[in-house]
A protein has these predicted regions:
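Conformational coupling and interaction surfaces
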Residues: 1, 20-29, 168-170, 185-320
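Generic secondary-structure boundary/loop-capping signal
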Residues: 68, 78, 84, 127, ...
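A residue-level signal for conserved active-site and pocket-lining positions in enzyme catalytic cores
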Residues: 63, 177, 245
Length: 320
């Protein structure tokens, strides 16, 4: 049983990733959700986390509001991808659930102490909260069991030719995290995510399943598909953050390589994750993470539908 904190900026794909983690209740215990500025501002990401938990019937899980801006930069966002509110602009109603009073960074530090050696962090937004936790508590790094994150890219970015959005929003925070010395980091970046797709057939299947959760996913991904069509003439969409949770559930979903990852914080390529693969570069001796390089699409779909809509997993895999 993985005891996890999801650090997130919901976000269309964040919402689906959270719902997947909640559906895998025999494998994952979500001990809390921390929010951060990213896809949209904190004034949306925190209520969005509360809305997702309400939809899933899991209002018992606490939400903690985190950093409203990057460490050293002004906030950036991606409303064109996620809608003006982060949840596809579908007008999801307000809910009664509210965030806790405790600051997300303090919660991260406290929970890592309480669950020393057990806690898995799943950051699927900018890494500002984690960087702050590292700065706050020298033992935080040692207390965390592992990190499975969505972020970065070895070869090609999505907001610049070289940078992925989460690292680009707060490169200083990403550098702090990769330099900190965590026991295990798995970086699920854009190289693997190319195959973590929801094609039109899978999206139609969600509509036909016709549950509140499946219809919610169908509705919020409309804006995702619109952006994919506008930029790539693709009628599907990549489920970036969902792949990180899938990889936690089944490490065979992605191929990974050992590497040393550094983050560029200045200049033309700021936000770029520079990946030195072990064995490719003779001078590289130190390894600080595993980098996902490829995703098996059918395995990804099997993990996602197998946990969320198990009675439809066979037809989903057939249409992947």
């Amino acid at each position: 049983m993985h005891k996890i904190i999801i650090d997130t900026d919901p976000g269309v794909d964040d919402a689906i990733a959270i719902l997947l983690a909640l559906a895998a209740k025999d494998e994952i215990e979500v001990v809390g959700i921390t929010t951060v500025n990213g896809n949209v501002g904190l004034h949306y990401t925190t209520p969005n986390a509360c809305k997702i938990l309400t939809l899933a019937g899991r209002t018992d899980i606490p939400v903690y509001s985190g950093c409203a801006k990057p460490l050293e930069r002004e906030p950036l966002s991606a409303e064109e991808v996620h809608g003006n509110d982060g949840l596809g602009g579908i007008g999801f109603p307000d809910v009664e659930k509210q965030p806790e009073e405790e600051f997300a960074v303090d919660f991260l530090v406290r929970k890592a102490r309480e669950l020393k050696g057990e806690l898995v962090l799943v950051p699927i937004g900018p890494l500002t909260n984690l960087a702050k936790a590292i700065e706050k508590d020298p033992e935080f790094v040692n207390n965390v069991k592992e990190i499975v994150m969505m972020g970065g890219a070895e070869f090609k970015g999505n907001v610049t030719p070289t940078a992925e959005f989460n690292f680009w929003v707060d490169p200083e925070a990403a550098k702090i995290v990769f330099d900190a010395g965590f026991k295990k980091i798995t970086m699920v970046g854009l190289d693997a995510i190319d195959n973590a797709r929801m094609n039109p057939a899978l999206r139609e299947l969600l509509y036909q399943i016709d549950t509140p959760v499946s219809k919610f996913i169908y509705d919020i991904t409309r804006v995702y598909v619109n952006e994919s069509w506008r930029t790539e003439k693709d009628l599907g969409c990549r489920l970036c953050d969902v792949l990180a949770v899938s990889q936690l559930l089944d490490p065979s979903v992605c191929k990974v390589v050992d590497a040393y990852v550094d983050i560029e914080t200045k200049g033309l390529c700021e936000g770029t994750s520079v990946v030195y693969r072990k064995g490719r570069y003779a001078h590289v001796q130190k390894v600080n993470c595993q980098v996902a390089t490829y995703c098996d699409t059918k395995k990804f779909v099997e993990v996602m539908f197998g946990r969320m809509f198990p009675e439809y997993v066979e037809v989903a895999v057939q249409n992947a």
